[in-house]
């Protein structure tokens, strides 16, 4: 509600980016009675909470699950946007080191819920997108500060709309491009750019390997490399999330490669990458896996923040201009943190009126 004496009017807000943070912010702002328009450069929502469906396989090739330890994100998942196919991955995550030694993981972390959906992790973002005004396949390339707020332009220079506030919910590199090319006060622009340049990301190659017959049953759902020296950063048994995700008598492993490996193999042909990754997987598991019957590959340039920047300092500079930022560049690369940050920053924006 507006403070006493303030006239209640519908305020217009543009959100650049339909990832989980931007979607959470959109609902928070709509709940406060504001008009929200989201601009998304792709035809999908959810960012790295992404799901593919190919040849009978359903798999999450970006973020793997949502940690359930947070009150805010858990309320969004279980109460605000409930779904019949929501599941808590039953098996734990174990760990391995450079030598390939596998052992049990942190028992405290493994007690926390690991939320996903039978139909894919992207189910949350698709549910959150319902009822929102989202302009897909629209890359915002330019911002201009006006006396009434902000003018937005797409990457071709065409007008995209006039708004009183703008929330930028994209990776820091894209946000930096928008500010560097934007027309806004010079001192504030440089201060914002200084903050955004402090954020950096790790690249990640995600490789999907389908097998028939199903790989050997393990006491864990996934393995994570804790000393960060192995070529494999993460290896998950995707069919453990839900048997409906794979064709009958098949299994699907998801290998997410370490930053150093991903950089080295970034431009290599897909077939060579898949072949090499399959060898690393078979060696780690010490299991005579057959040749994969299904493969897929995805390059994530901005997979996880290597360095975050101070979102509070950034928004302290930006909010007086009617501008704000949210997302993983400020809180780290976890879906639940992105959801929380979107809600928190949206509340800050609503409080500026």
Name the predicted role of every residue range.
Residues 65-72, 102, 106-127, 267-273:
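Short beta-strand to alpha-helix junction loop
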Residues 30-54:
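Glycine-rich FAD pyrophosphate-binding loop
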Residues 136-151:
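A conserved short coil-to-beta-strand element within the FAD-binding core of flavoproteins
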Residues 51-94:
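N-terminal FAD cofactor-binding segment of flavoenzymes
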Residues 24, 44, 61, 248-353:
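Conserved flavin/dinucleotide-binding core of flavoenzymes
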Residues 11-38, 346, 350:
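N-terminal Rossmann-like FAD-binding beta1-loop-alpha1 element of flavoenzymes
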């Amino acid at each position: 509600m507006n403070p006493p004496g303030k006239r209640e009017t519908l305020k217009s807000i543009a959100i650049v980016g339909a990832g989980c943070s931007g979607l959470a912010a959109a609902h928070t702002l709509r709940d406060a009675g504001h008009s929200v328009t989201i601009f998304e450069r792709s035809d999908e929502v959810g960012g790295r909470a992404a799901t593919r469906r190919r040849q009978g396989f359903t798999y999450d090739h970006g973020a793997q699950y949502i940690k359930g330890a947070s009150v805010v994100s858990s309320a969004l998942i279980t109460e605000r946007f409930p779904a019949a196919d929501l599941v808590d991955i039953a098996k734990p995550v174990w760990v391995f080191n450079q030598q390939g030694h596998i052992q049990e993981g942190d028992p405290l972390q493994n007690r926390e819920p690991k939320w996903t959906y039978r139909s894919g992790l992207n189910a949350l973002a698709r549910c959150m997108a319902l009822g929102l005004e989202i302009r897909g396949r629209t890359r915002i390339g330019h911002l201009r500060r006006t006396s009434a707020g902000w003018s937005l332009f797409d990457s071709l220079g065409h007008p995209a709309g006039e708004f009183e506030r703008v929330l930028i919910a994209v990776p820091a590199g894209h946000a930096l491009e928008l500010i560097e090319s934007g027309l806004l006060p010079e001192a504030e622009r440089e201060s914002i750019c200084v903050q955004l340049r402090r954020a950096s990301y790790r690249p990640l190659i995600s490789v999907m390997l389908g097998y028939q017959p199903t790989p050997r049953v393990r006491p864990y759902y996934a393995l994570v490399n804790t000393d960060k020296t192995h070529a494999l950063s993460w290896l998950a048994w995707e069919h453990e999330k839900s048997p409906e995700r794979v064709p009958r008598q098949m299994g699907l492993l998801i290998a997410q490669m370490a930053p150093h490996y991903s950089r080295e193999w970034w431009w290599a042909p897909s077939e060579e990458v898949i072949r090499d990754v399959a060898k690393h997987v078979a060696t780690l598991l010490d299991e005579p896996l057959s040749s994969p019957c299904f493969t897929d590959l995805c390059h994530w340039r901005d997979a996880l923040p290597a360095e975050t920047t101070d979102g509070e300092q950034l928004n302290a500079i930006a909010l007086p201009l009617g501008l704000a930022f949210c997302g993983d560049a400020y809180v780290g690369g976890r879906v639940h943190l992105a959801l929380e940050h979107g809600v928190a920053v949206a509340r800050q924006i609503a409080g500026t009126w």
